């Protein structure tokens, strides 16, 4: 998930959401071949946890993915982890800086050794920690595949209308907090700021989404 215009152009103008395109291709294959394995192509259920749930949240708002699955399960991930174009451009710029390659040089980007790409990716995550809600590499809004933020598509009734099971995994945050001193040191104000990056805006009644979600978590996990 790296919004690089040069790579998109080299693919005939395809959007930069190559990760989502891979998932859509896999779902198309499953739908086309499910019957051969005794399955029902009209009853496909997708299940994702953490980043997998975030991707499903994006697919639910992608018109091209409509009809490929009939129900979905999202655990510890939501439809809010998608970059607007300006945030995706920021991640792209920092990644190219770390890799030492111009964002306009598609050939050099494709030729970069895997080890260098992975090392640059790790440095980007660290550089942008605290500036952007992790993970830094996420799907992004584009005109071809994901025309709007999924959370907005849900609010407007434009996301896929299928049965959903949504939940969280108990104590999952501890896994991330172990390796993130900043997360372990969060106070109430810092927690609110972090949620505001992930859930900007307000509900129809004018209350910030971030504050509402924090209240819901506290009410469900007393003590």
Identify what each model region corresponds to.
Residues 113:
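Acidic, glycine-rich loop-and-strand cores that form catalytic or ligand-binding grooves
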Residues 116-223:
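Substrate-gating cap/lid region and adjacent catalytic-acid/histidine neighborhood
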Residues 1-103, 123, 154-180:
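Serine-hydrolase-like catalytic core of hydrolytic proteins
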